[in-house]
């Protein structure tokens, strides 16, 4: 292994590697039972007619060593675009080569070319290794914020309520 890290935009041919990376993150957290996405979901929503996300892959000696899945975001406070990192994963054998940092550095540079000024992400509260990594490269915890989410039945209840016609007085 030469250790040379090459970063490039993911293609549909990387869908399986991206899915594998997501599964590896879930496995680290003991939550593989919660993953319901499929490789076909990655192909459809990442590389279809209206992609919902983009991805970068890192390669070492031609092998996928890591991946970063992200999508566009907008800050109404800052009045500028940025990106939200959904997943960042580096295969264990390629850790300590700077792969994760290189992926995020490339993402920051790409984001800046698009007029973006920030990267946001969330980290599982139990994943202290990832928290330390992000701190070391300058992506710091935003202490004043908490993440809220609506999934499954809660999401369906919101969507069902939104299906009702709006009445104006």
What is the predicted role of each segment?
Residues 101, 125-144, 150:
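Conserved active-site alpha-helix within GNAT-family acetyltransferase domains
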Residues 112-122:
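Conserved GNAT acetyl-CoA-binding A-motif
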Residues 6-20:
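A short beta-loop-alpha structural element at the N-terminal edge
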Residues 19, 23-45:
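Conserved GNAT-fold acetyl-CoA-binding loop/helix
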Residues 96-109, 136:
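Conserved acetyl-CoA-binding loop-helix of GNAT-fold acetyltransferases
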Residues 57, 63-72:
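Conserved beta-strand in the GNAT
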């Amino acid at each position: 292994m030469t250790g040379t890290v090459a970063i490039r935009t993911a293609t549909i041919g990387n869908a399986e590697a991206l899915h594998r990376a997501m599964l590896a993150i879930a496995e680290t957290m003991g939550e593989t039972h919660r993953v319901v996405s499929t490789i076909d979901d990655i192909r459809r929503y990442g590389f279809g007619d209206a992609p919902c996300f983009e991805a970068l892959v890192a390669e070492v000696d031609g092998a996928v060593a890591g991946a970063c899945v992200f999508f566009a975001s907008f800050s109404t406070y800052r009045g500028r675009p940025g990106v939200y990192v959904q997943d960042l994963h580096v295969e264990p054998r390629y850790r300590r080569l700077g792969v994760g940092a290189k992926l995020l550095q490339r993402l920051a540079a790409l984001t800046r070319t698009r007029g973006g000024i920030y990267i946001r992400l969330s980290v599982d509260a139990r994943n202290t290794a990832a928290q330390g990594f992000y701190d070391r490269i300058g992506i710091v915890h935003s202490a004043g914020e908490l993440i809220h989410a609506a999934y499954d039945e809660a999401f369906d209840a919101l969507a069902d309520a939104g299906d009702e016609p709006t009445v104006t007085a």
